[in-house]
From Swiss-Prot:
Pfam families cross-referenced by the UniProt entry: PIN_5 (PF08745)
EC number(s) recorded for this UniProt protein: 3.1.26.5
PANTHER family: RNA-FREE RIBONUCLEASE P, UPF0278 PROTEIN TK1425
Protein name: RNA-free ribonuclease P
Organism of origin: Haloarcula marismortui (strain ATCC 43049 / DSM 3752 / JCM 8966 / VKM B-1809)
Keyword terms: Endonuclease, Hydrolase, Nuclease, tRNA processing
Amino acid sequence: MVDRPLKQRFVLDTSLFLTPEIRSGDEDLEAACLDLLDLISEAKLVHNISCYMPPSIQAELTTMLEDRAISDEVLTKLDTWVITKSPAHHEVRIPADLVYEFIDEMSERVDRGLRVSEKAVRKAEESRAETVEEHDHMTEVDKVISDLRDEYRDTLRQGVLDSREDFDLLILAQELDAGVVTEDQGIINWAEDFGLRYLKGRNFPPLLREYLAADDPDRWRDES
């Protein structure tokens, strides 16, 4: 058996478990989650690699898995092998420059959102009497409003921190000096600003397999 490497810590985002990128072939969500949690448990036992989630992320993920009728086995393994820890909100310090940057970015996004709204209003005014083909119950104005919601949401939220859960993830990672594992580009952008290590969710299972293969190459390189 090889010597254990320096202890590694990771803080996991909801997107890690839900992304299709961690699935093999025609593997479904439940099978992919079980495979991932098995890797996490083996990495903990063999190399003392610890995985964490803030309570807000754990609750969000549990709700999403339950909504998808995922078995209790997955939820039990999640509770067993992923440590739920509240971030130290009053102890972790955030540079003022990052706060100013966030304020400036959100102000710019609000301005862009207003332009999206103005464009939609003009379009609705031009076509309010028309109906949408194949949808007799939906007027062109309804269609414009529907498109507006999607475009406005993308303009304001894509690539930015947009929830307390995202912020909890970063604060906990900073507190623990841990790597962030996520598929969310907004979290990745801010992990860079915080000076945190991060990893795309799709690359996390291969990373754990490499750690495990260093100890048992015959088993883990065959399974990868």
